[in-house]
């Protein structure tokens, strides 16, 4: 399928919208009430610091809603305003934040049901309005909705679209796309649908396995056993690793993505030499500015003397998980929560350690003067961060 031609055709359809409906002022009040916070604004103005009795709060200097998320949420609100009575669907969570998605449900936005890991579009009919979320949708889903006669509102983040353009460039030049991402993440699923031949690597360890295989140090059966669910149909590691381009899920750790890019550049240089490098490796620049800024701010925050860290965001939010990873790697006692209600008045906290299920921990806030670092993922509203801080203040006063 010529995905580039399909996108171009879709963008010219009168049933497709990716620019909103000119109703920004009409929804501004609702967005402000639901998501913004005067407390967070004052903390920003005070050098990202709040001192309250024995509690000292240190906010990361970049956190929370990025402009791509703000755009997607605003477009969803505009869509409901523009189509007040039409049946309105969204193909997935608009962003990875439970409170935002709950607000959409309250606006009678229906989420495409998922049965055994497969989306069920059987209830979607001609004339329905369907929102594509911030991290996009697969080209097959777009094609299905277009053929069904739906009105499509595309809130895909432009940074994600940039990655799609990158893998389409790889495909056009018959390069295999090495995608740094999580195989089942919605963004990576969408990106791979626009690619030709592709292989998804989770981290530097998996990238090293691929690099070793390219240089002749690997077993084909073992390789395919590991990557069989992370590659394009018919992928052949003996043929499809000769020409590589690198792309990434925009919410992955920036430093790791850069290391993976350098690893494959060195690998292809070693195999093919400097004169042929450009024929076998395509450099890339698909790292999202907002993701980079939040990670950089987190690295700065963990340099401060902190007693503990609270990271706020959806448990399925990749960028939030990576912020938690930064704190853990620095040896800081850190808690990933998705809602303020995870912090209880009895000084316990329900949180999700890296790679584990939810656990409850007692004696969350220590006695005496305590310095708490706080950050939040790109899908977390300031209002949610405010409510977390209010709970911390209450705990510091009562315990």
Curated annotation (Swiss-Prot):
<dbReference type="GO" id="GO:0051539">
    <property type="term" value="F:4 iron, 4 sulfur cluster binding"/>
</dbReference>
<feature type="binding site">
    <location>
        <position position="96"/>
    </location>
    <ligand>
        <name>isopentenyl diphosphate</name>
    </ligand>
</feature>
<feature type="binding site">
    <location>
        <position position="250"/>
    </location>
    <ligand>
        <name>(2E)-4-hydroxy-3-methylbut-2-enyl diphosphate</name>
    </ligand>
</feature>
<feature type="binding site">
    <location>
        <position position="318"/>
    </location>
    <ligand>
        <name>dimethylallyl diphosphate</name>
    </ligand>
</feature>
<keyword id="KW-0411">Iron-sulfur</keyword>
<feature type="binding site">
    <location>
        <position position="317"/>
    </location>
    <ligand>
        <name>isopentenyl diphosphate</name>
    </ligand>
</feature>
<dbReference type="GO" id="GO:0046872">
    <property type="term" value="F:metal ion binding"/>
</dbReference>
<protein>
    <recommendedName>
        <fullName>4-hydroxy-3-methylbut-2-enyl diphosphate reductase</fullName>
        <ecNumber>1.17.7.4</ecNumber>
    </recommendedName>
</protein>
<feature type="binding site">
    <location>
        <position position="379"/>
    </location>
    <ligand>
        <name>isopentenyl diphosphate</name>
    </ligand>
</feature>
<feature type="binding site">
    <location>
        <position position="317"/>
    </location>
    <ligand>
        <name>(2E)-4-hydroxy-3-methylbut-2-enyl diphosphate</name>
    </ligand>
</feature>
<feature type="binding site">
    <location>
        <position position="185"/>
    </location>
    <ligand>
        <name>isopentenyl diphosphate</name>
    </ligand>
</feature>
<dbReference type="GO" id="GO:0016114">
    <property type="term" value="P:terpenoid biosynthetic process"/>
</dbReference>
<dbReference type="Pfam" id="PF02401">
    <property type="entry name" value="LYTB"/>
</dbReference>
<feature type="binding site">
    <location>
        <position position="319"/>
    </location>
    <ligand>
        <name>(2E)-4-hydroxy-3-methylbut-2-enyl diphosphate</name>
    </ligand>
</feature>
<feature type="binding site">
    <location>
        <position position="96"/>
    </location>
    <ligand>
        <name>dimethylallyl diphosphate</name>
    </ligand>
</feature>
<dbReference type="GO" id="GO:0050992">
    <property type="term" value="P:dimethylallyl diphosphate biosynthetic process"/>
</dbReference>
<feature type="binding site">
    <location>
        <position position="379"/>
    </location>
    <ligand>
        <name>(2E)-4-hydroxy-3-methylbut-2-enyl diphosphate</name>
    </ligand>
</feature>
<feature type="binding site">
    <location>
        <position position="318"/>
    </location>
    <ligand>
        <name>(2E)-4-hydroxy-3-methylbut-2-enyl diphosphate</name>
    </ligand>
</feature>
<feature type="binding site">
    <location>
        <position position="66"/>
    </location>
    <ligand>
        <name>[4Fe-4S] cluster</name>
    </ligand>
</feature>
<feature type="binding site">
    <location>
        <position position="96"/>
    </location>
    <ligand>
        <name>(2E)-4-hydroxy-3-methylbut-2-enyl diphosphate</name>
    </ligand>
</feature>
<comment type="similarity">
    <text>Belongs to the IspH family.</text>
</comment>
<dbReference type="GO" id="GO:0019288">
    <property type="term" value="P:isopentenyl diphosphate biosynthetic process, methylerythritol 4-phosphate pathway"/>
</dbReference>
<comment type="pathway">
    <text>Isoprenoid biosynthesis; isopentenyl diphosphate biosynthesis via DXP pathway; isopentenyl diphosphate from 1-deoxy-D-xylulose 5-phosphate: step 6/6.</text>
</comment>
<comment type="function">
    <text>Catalyzes the conversion of 1-hydroxy-2-methyl-2-(E)-butenyl 4-diphosphate (HMBPP) into a mixture of isopentenyl diphosphate (IPP) and dimethylallyl diphosphate (DMAPP). Acts in the terminal step of the DOXP/MEP pathway for isoprenoid precursor biosynthesis.</text>
</comment>
<feature type="binding site">
    <location>
        <position position="317"/>
    </location>
    <ligand>
        <name>dimethylallyl diphosphate</name>
    </ligand>
</feature>
<keyword id="KW-0004">4Fe-4S</keyword>
<comment type="pathway">
    <text>Isoprenoid biosynthesis; dimethylallyl diphosphate biosynthesis; dimethylallyl diphosphate from (2E)-4-hydroxy-3-methylbutenyl diphosphate: step 1/1.</text>
</comment>
<feature type="binding site">
    <location>
        <position position="185"/>
    </location>
    <ligand>
        <name>(2E)-4-hydroxy-3-methylbut-2-enyl diphosphate</name>
    </ligand>
</feature>
<keyword id="KW-0414">Isoprene biosynthesis</keyword>
<feature type="binding site">
    <location>
        <position position="318"/>
    </location>
    <ligand>
        <name>isopentenyl diphosphate</name>
    </ligand>
</feature>
<feature type="binding site">
    <location>
        <position position="288"/>
    </location>
    <ligand>
        <name>[4Fe-4S] cluster</name>
    </ligand>
</feature>
<feature type="binding site">
    <location>
        <position position="185"/>
    </location>
    <ligand>
        <name>dimethylallyl diphosphate</name>
    </ligand>
</feature>
<keyword id="KW-0479">Metal-binding</keyword>
<keyword id="KW-0560">Oxidoreductase</keyword>
<dbReference type="InterPro" id="IPR003451">
    <property type="entry name" value="LytB/IspH"/>
</dbReference>
<feature type="active site" description="Proton donor">
    <location>
        <position position="187"/>
    </location>
</feature>
<feature type="binding site">
    <location>
        <position position="157"/>
    </location>
    <ligand>
        <name>[4Fe-4S] cluster</name>
    </ligand>
</feature>
<dbReference type="GO" id="GO:0051745">
    <property type="term" value="F:4-hydroxy-3-methylbut-2-enyl diphosphate reductase activity"/>
</dbReference>
<feature type="binding site">
    <location>
        <position position="379"/>
    </location>
    <ligand>
        <name>dimethylallyl diphosphate</name>
    </ligand>
</feature>
<feature type="binding site">
    <location>
        <position position="319"/>
    </location>
    <ligand>
        <name>dimethylallyl diphosphate</name>
    </ligand>
</feature>
<keyword id="KW-0408">Iron</keyword>
<feature type="binding site">
    <location>
        <position position="319"/>
    </location>
    <ligand>
        <name>isopentenyl diphosphate</name>
    </ligand>
</feature>
